[in-house]
């Protein structure tokens, strides 16, 4: 009995090393598990479900093969792929979950999320997030031709990279009080999220109880997987060279 969690792969046609490692993971490791959870930023950028490039087709095919084999796959959007919609889910067999979801992880209620909503000190990002999650603005964006949306997406991506370099480390990390507040609100003592690219297991206290916050790693330099069984969870890495083994 195994459940796997991944996040922050930032898949793109340019990073074939990440894509190859991911496809190997899907074809080998994810085949005989209870469930796969993808906690956001699966893609470097998502400009609409109508983008059907050869690169995206192979990613969707990998998920479809897995779900057709009987492995349920769940997705929570991140700050790079929040425009993923129903068409993508239909084509892959994945289930789109609310941005804050409590699951039963082998008897333990566990809050899963991407993690960007925990960074409440990053006021510039929160203002940006509020704008791009506006349904009317999203409708206007989808009215644009796909090629123009690609240009807009590239501009947003380059601007985001520049802004992040100018921000302090503390602003870009989660706000501890917000973590405790949300866990107390959801009545859980276990949380799993990504977004910060700082894999670790944090032992904290929520309402006088010992609690655990597990942070998933990104896939920039190697694969990062949280492997959970009824006996517990462990953060593991997957070397890009494993695809050749």
UniProtKB/Swiss-Prot annotation:
Residue ranges crossing the lipid bilayer per the database entry: none
Binding annotation for substrate: 79-80, 122, 160, 164, 167, 195
This protein's UniProt keywords: Cell inner membrane, Cell membrane, Hydrolase, Lipid A biosynthesis, Lipid biosynthesis, Lipid metabolism, Manganese, Membrane, Metal-binding
This enzyme's EC code(s): 3.6.1.54
InterPro entries on file: Calcineurin-like_PHP_ApaH (IPR004843), LpxH-like (IPR043461), Metallo-depent_PP-like (IPR029052), UDP-diacylglucosamine_Hdrlase (IPR010138)
Protein source organism: Photobacterium profundum (strain SS9)
Keyword Repeat: no
Membrane topology: Peripheral membrane protein
PANTHER family xref list: UDP-2,3-DIACYLGLUCOSAMINE HYDROLASE, UDP-2,3-DIACYLGLUCOSAMINE HYDROLASE-RELATED
Recorded superkingdom: Bacteria
Official protein name in the record: UDP-2,3-diacylglucosamine hydrolase
